[in-house]
Regions:
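Glycine-rich phosphate/pyrophosphate-handling loop used in enzymes and phosphotransfer proteins
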Residues: 1-216
Length: 216
């Protein structure tokens, strides 16, 4: 992110498997990304003292308990990362967290879960040129089962508006749903985006839905 050259130090896993070590971010920049602590909401990984966060309490009143996993805090350097990657279109930055994401999701893949990225509307995809979530999942198998209607950007909405927004997502025609699904997003804020997708998966064939985001 700082445009400095990267010194690659081989890691044990690459030495043992004779594979190439890939580093896409310098050590200095990577040190600014902070992982979520163990003191957090058990449902959505929000860092709080005590038990459930307010958002999860709201979801429970609607009959939904989040089952979410996240890795990093959405603050400071991570916000700058998404500004460059998502909004300024620096597609190369999708590679920075590939190893972190693979480490988090591979155990679920081994248990038979199918990764499902949050989609963009056709209008947003044409504007951005890529789906940032699919970029983060590069190298991992995933299935596109959802489509999305064009609506106002989430970032322009208030917290209350996000929670009460009508469902813009739909399941594509002739899609075979897996029994166990992981919905993957880039950032988790109130959980409204993921909740609307989970609603659509309330079907007999779907046994379990887990959700994941890079940042929380």
């Amino acid at each position: 992110m700082c445009n400095e050259s990267i010194e690659v130090i081989p890691r044990l896993r690459y030495l043992l498997t004779f594979t190439e070590s890939k580093e896409y971010c310098c050590t200095e920049c990577k040190s600014h990304f902070k992982k979520l602590s163990k003191v957090r909401c058990p449902n959505c990984y929000k860092e709080i003292q005590g038990n459930e966060c307010v958002d999860c309490q709201i979801w429970k009143k609607k009959g939904y308990t989040p089952n979410h996993i996240a890795i990093f805090r959405y603050e400071g350097f991570m916000k700058e990362y998404f500004s460059q990657y998502k909004f300024m279109g620096d597609y190369y930055l999708r590679k920075i967290f590939q190893e972190d994401i693979a480490d988090a999701l591979n155990p679920l893949l081994k248990k038979g879960y199918t990764l499902v990225p949050v989609p963009l509307s056709e209008e947003r995809f044409a504007e951005r040129g890529f789906n940032q979530v699919e970029g983060l999942l590069e190298g991992l198998p995933y299935q596109n089962i959802f489509g999305k209607k064009d609506i106002e950007k989430q970032s322009s909405k208030t917290r209350k508006e996000r929670l009460n927004q009508e469902n813009p997502f739909f399941i594509k025609q002739n899609v075979e749903l897996s029994r166990k699904i992981v919905i993957v997003d880039d950032i988790y804020t109130t959980g409204s985006t993921i909740y609307k997708m989970v609603q659509l998966l309330q079907k007999p064939d779907v046994e379990e839905v887990v959700t994941f985001s890079l940042a929380r």
